[in-house]
Amino acid sequence: MATEYALRMGDGKRIYLTKEKIIAEIEDGTANAADLGEIPALNANEMEKLAEILMMPGKTVSVEQGMEVPVTHDIGTIRLDGDQGNSGVGIPSSRLVGCMTHERAFGADTMELGHIDYSFKPVKPVVSNECQAMEVCQQNMIIPLFYGAMPNMGLYYTPDGPFENPGDLMKAFKIPEAWESMEHAAEHLTRDTVWVMQKLFASGADGVNFDTTGAAGDGDMYGTLHAIEALRKEFPDMYIEAGMAGECVLGMHGNLQYDGVTLAGLWPHQQAPLVAKAGANVFGPVCNTNTSKTSAWNLARAVTFMKAAVEASPIPCHVDMGMGVGGIPMLETPPIDAVTRASKAMVEIAGVDGIOIGVGDPMGMPIAHIMASGMTGMRAAGDLVARMEFSKNMRIGEAKEYVAKKLGVDQMDLVDEHVMRELREELDIGIITSVPGAAKGIAAKMNIEKLLDIKINSCNLFRKQIA
């Protein structure tokens, strides 16, 4: 009897497949992506490697030593303190505690602060509260800390916003009116996002994470690209990550263009150059999970799309890897076996520069991804490599080489806790364990500035305050 291997369906249900069936599913999945995106399918060696990853006997798997990448985040601390029946585990804790838990306990390379409603529009009335939270977090933390939110253009339509719902207008065959409503909403999205981030950047934020760009279609992406462009023009040193909502930009409007390119119907490899042109430092491509297909099919399809995006992108790519994207099952508690295999495949086959950790409980998302492919933040040198990706748009290889040279170590040492524990204390750039007298918060980041020859926004704010 043929050996069967434990895999998952796209909804997380466990299934058992033979190697022959796994290979067939991989071939079908990569062919689907190649056909839709008009991109190369995985070659025979890549498909064989993906099959090997899926068939590994361990519950968890990880990248080969030396291939680790930095992680970024969506939803911020909501996975800890959120309690809405989704992936939040409802731990009553402040956002400072949540952010520092990711930094000190989870070994995150970066982190983000976000509002419980997690969209830019609801932040406007409480922006002063967000600014104070950002200041307090920056005073206590060392890893890069973003402000994250969704552009969420749907909030600008009735009954939540001022503009008539284009869906209702289209049903009434009022197409020009629907276009006009989307265009007005996109303008307001740009304006609100820029205004919110002007306040947060003045409060020390390292940058911004645009989560689920394009969720409301091409108008949503249009407004976000113009927001990125405006922020880059005003703040040349702001870290900007733009993560997508889906693999293909929905043509709700159909005629909107950016830099002469029609946005409707763009696939990840076509989205990447536009996001870079707008001024983002890091692009977060997406491939949606099909819940009725196997993990072999979904992961092959996702890796195919991401490999093409990485090759086409002028900037680092942090593939979105929350539940329901990136070959990961659509389940609030994502199966760790599926998450770690997807994480490994994205790094070793697609060649991504990082992982954007998305929605899912703490064990199934940040802990699983960081164990599988992360650089473990301040336990080693993950935060330093992440800063070079964002401050200088360095791809993963260049960023590691730069940091290793500055530290005077081999690249393998960047993820060696024994080497980095001693070195971080010697250089006074922040250590993960609490040592009296060691530089913390702003002081440690000022030493990182000197080490890496960069400027850090929270340090600039502190210098202004004591001038």
Curated annotation (Swiss-Prot):
It comes from the Archaea. Keywords: Methanogenesis, Methyltransferase, Pyrrolysine, Transferase. Its EC number is 2.1.1.249. Pathway: One-carbon metabolism; methanogenesis from dimethylamine. The keyword Transferase applies. The keyword Transferase applies. Pfam families: Dimeth_Pyl. InterPro entries: Dimeth_MeTrfase_MtbB (IPR012653). GO terms for biological process: methanogenesis; methylation. It catalyses: Co(I)-[dimethylamine-specific corrinoid protein] + dimethylamine + H(+) = methyl-Co(III)-[dimethylamine-specific corrinoid protein] + methylamine. One of its GO terms (molecular function) is dimethylamine methyltransferase activity. Catalyzes the transfer of a methyl group from dimethylamine to the corrinoid cofactor of MtbC. Belongs to the dimethylamine methyltransferase family. This is Dimethylamine methyltransferase MtbB1. The gene is mtbB1.
